[in-house]
Amino acid sequence: MPRIYRVVGETATGMRFRVEVTAEKPYDAVEKVYSLIGSRHKLSRVQIKIREVAVVSPEEARSDAAKLLMAVDRVVRY
């Protein structure tokens, strides 16, 4: 069952970030953040430092996208 993870860190340029993603495991959440931050800001994995990964309840989540994904109980493909 997917959970919402809040990943906190900073980049080599000094930019701090807090991203909420849905994932099965903390490792998957970190991989997704590396992909998102790296593609948005043209950074490699070495330039992204992850400080904290925590499970967040849907009520505590700040990201509307993460809340909506947790509300979906099934996906139908036509």
Curated annotation (Swiss-Prot):
GO terms for cellular component: ribonucleoprotein complex; ribosome. Keywords: Ribonucleoprotein, Ribosomal protein, RNA-binding, rRNA-binding. One of its GO terms (biological process) is translation. The keyword Calcium does not apply. Coiled coil: none annotated. GO terms for molecular function: large ribosomal subunit rRNA binding; structural constituent of ribosome. Part of the 50S ribosomal subunit. Binds 23S rRNA. Belongs to the eukaryotic ribosomal protein eL20 family. This is Large ribosomal subunit protein eL20. It comes from Pyrobaculum neutrophilum (strain DSM 2338 / JCM 9278 / NBRC 100436 / V24Sta).
